[in-house]
Structure formats: structure tokens, C-alpha cells
Amino acid sequence: MHLDILKNADPEVYAAIQSELERQTDTLELIASENFTSRAVMEACGSVMTNKYAEGYPGKRFYGGCEFVDVAEDLARDRAKKLFSCEYANVQPHSGSSANMAVIFTFCKPGDTILGFDLSHGGHLTHGSPVNFSGQFYNAHFYGVEKETGRIDMNRVEEKAKEVKPKLIICGASAYSRDWEYAEFRRIADSVDAILMADIAHPAGLIATGLLNDPMPHCHVVTTTTHKTLRGPRGGMILMGKDFENPMGIKAKTKTGERIKMVSELLDAMVMPGIQGGPLMHVIAGKAVAFGEALNPEYKQYMEQVRKNAAAMAEQFISLGYDIISGGTDNHLMLIDLRNKDITGKKTENLLHEAGITVNKNMVPFDDKSPFVTSGFRVGAAAMTTREMKEAEAKTIVKFIDKVISNAGSENISAICQEVKEEVNALCQQFPLYDFVPAS
């Protein structure tokens, strides 16, 4: 990643990239949806693949000269299928939101009912939020967590499904720290004749390595991002454990008559030309590299350490008097309720930023504050683990966070943040992010 040419060609963009490199190198990244890709992934994403238009799919492109981008996409698809032990993979979605849109558009018509996890309880915008297409085009209903436990009660999910009779049920979240009961969700979906979709954008790496429940045998369709715990480039993907005939009865003409189209055909057509045109072949090349990395034994060791680090952080937070929604974590993240600390998520995010620690403010279940203020914040262990930090460092980081929050009302808070920032920087120096380029 040598930027000498860029430095001379466009000093302003170069300066922004260099400053971002320094930020990532010298601060602690705890945003649960962020991670650090390898140099190999970045080289693939910065390659000549960016020059090629390739509308369509390998072997069936609308442009010529696609024989080598076909190789990259086939590698990405084959590796994804091997990684998740599934029969179908579409690696073209530009994002997790695009993947979700393609699935919802495939199975639902405008006005159909969908049932998803409440955004304010830890869900995602694309699961029915009224500010998103999923809540504007569809009749969206929600299930959430129980106030007493912070966990999803499957009996309540079943009651809601029977009440609203959705066409599609979505399981998955952006801020839920527990594993998902996919088999039970499937039983409920079958009872109301609904399609079941799992959005595993956050725990995908833990699922791929067998550390969390596998949605593939139970969910009709699975979507994910390719960054976060998968540690690849920013993008999306659609998977199916097993292809099947579409339940809407959409047919294709054959030489001898008609046949029911497979769901894979509908999904492929919805991704392109339905919602996208040309795929980002440089990103797909990066996805192929990342999936190859995830198939190595070292990746499972990494994911095991992510889980250990998250558990250590949760334990330390609890020992210091913090409330974690659901009382702990099964995956890489946790959601901290700050209402007993008399500080907002917004203020916490800002103060920690001053201290060299990046988190995001986050609504907690039954929050009485706006999404721009919030009563909580979210923490994830994936990025710090990529730096090879372990449980001891995880607990130290929580102590840094507590030092800032506990002194938030102090007249000396700026000086305290600076002290913590120096400690953070010293810790980061012990665990360098990249060894192929200096940080300044």
C-alpha cells in the first residue's frame, strides 16, 4: 500500500487517507461493525479489476472480455459455499442492505406483511424501519426483547407471527449479543406459511467457524455483509443452504412446456438487473481473497479469540457496575445500558473519541432518548482481536472506558481523556495494526 503516486497526483486525498491510517493505527476501534482487512484484500480491491464492467454472471455476461473477472467471481462464490457449507451464493450485492433488498423484493410485493426484529431493540434498518424502504414499501411488524431479560422470547415471536401472518420473517440484528434459535424460528415460519430469512451480517464469522448456531439448515435464505467478522471488503452476499422451487409458482418456459423457477434464479435476477447493474469486480476479487483467508485454520483461532475477548470485556463491564443488555454476550459484541451511570450514549461516544477509543452510541431496548442521543453504546471485539489483543488487553480497555465515563462530570475530564489517550496510544504501539507501511 505505497501511495507515492497518489501523494503527487492529489495531495488532498492522500492527506485524508494518511490521516485515516494514523487514526486507525493509533486508536482503539471498538465499533462492532468494523474490522481491519488484510493487505491482500486491499490489493485486490485496488487492482485493475476496478476497470471492468461485467453485467450478468460468470459465463452469461452482457459484455465481452470477462473471462478473468469470471475467474474471480467463481472463486468468490465457490469459497463462500465451502465456507458456509451451502449450495448457493450470490456475491454481487454491493452491501448488506442491497442483499436484504434483493431478498425482500424477491418474496414480497409492496404492501405485504413482514415481521422483523425491532430496530430500537437491536434490529437493523432494513428489517422494517419506517425510515427505510423495508418499512415504506411493506406492512412491517416487529418482535423485540423482554424488558426483564433483554432476550427474545420465542413464545412472543410466535404470538406475533400468528397475529400478523407475515409473508416474510427476518431474524438477525445489529446490536443483539445472544445466539439465534433458527430452528424455532423455522417452526414458527412454517406454522404461518412464511419465508424465513436470516441476516447474519454481524456473527457471520462465528457461524462459518461453527461457534454459533448455523442458520443454513433452517432458513430459506441467508444474507450477510462481507466485512465485520468476516474481515473482508465492504459488501454483501446472499446464501442458501439448499436451493428450492419458488413458492410463488413463478414459471419459466422450456422447449417442452413450463417449469417452476428455482429461488436461485429469482434471486440472481433480482440482484441483477433487478436492483443493480454492473457488479464491483474489484470488491468481488477482495471478497474471494477474504473467503480464502477465512477457510484457513488460523481464522477459526481468530474467531475463538474474538469470542473470548468479548466475554472478558462483558465480565469486566459487569464487575464495574455496568448493565449489559441480556446480561452478557454469546458473540463478538455487547450493548451497554448507561441509564444507571447518568450519562448519555452521545456524550460517552464523544468523550471516548477524545480518549482515542471509537465506539458508537446506540439505543437500548425501551429507550426514552432519541437515536441521536441514546441511553447506551455498543462495543465489539473483532477489530481489537485482529491486532492480536487478548483477554488481558480486553479488560484493560474496559478500564480505560470506565475511567472516562466515571469522570465525565469532572472539571478535569479533558485532562483525564488526554491521559487515557496516551495509555491507548501506548497499547496500540504494542499491537501494531499493519507492518507494511509506517503510520506517518
Swiss-Prot record:
GO terms for molecular function: glycine hydroxymethyltransferase activity; pyridoxal phosphate binding. One of its GO terms (biological process) is tetrahydrofolate interconversion. One of its GO terms (cellular component) is cytosol. Its cofactor is pyridoxal 5'-phosphate. Keywords: Amino-acid biosynthesis, Cytoplasm, One-carbon metabolism, Pyridoxal phosphate, Transferase. InterPro entries: PyrdxlP-dep_Trfase, PyrdxlP-dep_Trfase_major, PyrdxlP-dep_Trfase_small, Ser_HO-MeTrfase, Ser_HO-MeTrfase-like, Ser_HO-MeTrfase_PLP_BS, SHMT-like_dom. Signal peptide: none annotated. Pathway: One-carbon metabolism; tetrahydrofolate interconversion; Amino-acid biosynthesis; glycine biosynthesis; glycine from L-serine: step 1/1. (6S)-5,6,7,8-tetrahydrofolate binds at L119, G123, H124, L125, S370, P371, F372. It catalyses: (6R)-5,10-methylene-5,6,7,8-tetrahydrofolate + glycine + H2O = (6S)-5,6,7,8-tetrahydrofolate + L-serine. It is found in: Cytoplasm. Its main location: cytoplasm. The modification N6-(pyridoxal phosphate)lysine is found at K228. The record marks H227 as: Plays an important role in substrate specificity. SUPFAM superfamilies: PLP-dependent transferases (SSF53383). Its EC number is 2.1.2.1. Catalyzes the reversible interconversion of serine and glycine with tetrahydrofolate (THF) serving as the one-carbon carrier. This reaction serves as the major source of one-carbon groups required for the biosynthesis of purines, thymidylate, methionine, and other important biomolecules. Also exhibits THF-independent aldolase activity toward beta-hydroxyamino acids, producing glycine and aldehydes, via a retro-aldol mechanism. Belongs to the SHMT family. This is Serine hydroxymethyltransferase. It comes from Chloroherpeton thalassium (strain ATCC 35110 / GB-78).
